Amino acid sequence: MKRVRFCLLVLLVLTTACKPTPKSGYIAVPTVTKNALSGVYTLSPKHSTAKLYYEELGQGESVILLHEHSVDCRMWDDVFYKLAKKYRVIRYDLRGYGKSDMPEVGFGFLQADDLCNFMDGLGIKKAHLAGLSLGGMTLADFVALYPERVLTATITSGAISAFPDRSKAPKQLLKIYNDTIFTLKRQEVDKNMKRGMDTLKMEWKGAMKSISGKHYRSIKRELNHMIDDWHAWQWTHPETDAFIGAQADSLLSKQKTHPPVLFLIGQYDSKGSKRSMQKMAALCKESRIEMIQDAGHFTAMECPDEFVNRMERFIDAH
């Protein structure tokens, strides 16, 4: 038994050593972005830009991967290296996560605007995009705001967010709304600080386990390690809304043509995630829904081979 374990360890070390080293760097994006509606401060931010950390590998058409809340771009490890055999693959830490800069409290930005500015910084006009949960919500906004920048979008574990449409609200009403939400979030931060990050993260890990599928054991260590590394900035600071929410509904319904969108639903994912993807699929004419059996919320981690195969088939078809 010891010999078997030793051989497996050697195989793991050799496999890791054989992985190509990706290029890494930072792209600066504006601290306050053009489509943001949630900022509460009118003064200039302390820093005019925020830096987004990214890794890049491979050649060909550009593929950009967007991660889930509470983790970082490492969640794409298996998918990243598989796709890099055929494409120029880029993964980055969204603002507020991983090695990227944290947001400035009170200043509004959209994750979708960050993605657009990030692509501009890398000289990418159009790309294939994939996002999981937080990343999927970002792509829902991006498809609504920047459809001309999308070759294909693969969205999994969440799409249109639940934030109300504030785009047509009078400025004074919008200010009252933002100030009220900001005050409520300050109160949430106070409660979080009293409970402590260890307790909150332990509960969060349990919540992620409850919506994972049959392969949870295979991702548990890596997933929990990323959650442990997470700064939890969103729990310790009053966060502005980084999504357009229901505004995406009206934008998508007005679009005469839509970029091709693939929705990958994990069999054991939450009902809310499934509903948000089904809702967006109904608005996008060029969309397709597929279910990944035995997978839960973290489809790309739980079933990376199937995720890549389905994504590549969809890209090839368009």
Go through the PLM ranges and name each one:
Residues A50-D101:
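Conserved HGGG/HGGXW glycine-rich cap/lid loop of the alpha/beta-hydrolase fold
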Residues K2-F6, L14, C18-V63, K86-Y87, ...:
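Alpha/beta-hydrolase fold catalytic core
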Residues S270-S276:
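Conserved alpha/beta-hydrolase "acid-adjacent" motif
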Residues T257, F263-I265:
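Short beta-strand/loop motif that positions the catalytic acidic residue
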Residues Q187-Q255:
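Conserved alpha/beta-hydrolase catalytic His-Asp/Glu region
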Residues E286-H318:
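Catalytic active-site module of serine/aspartate enzymes centered on a nucleophile-bearing elbow/loop
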Residues L57, R91-A130, L134, N309:
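Active-site loop/oxyanion-hole signature of alpha/beta-hydrolase fold enzymes
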Residues A144, T152-V189:
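Flexible "cap/lid" loop of the alpha/beta hydrolase fold
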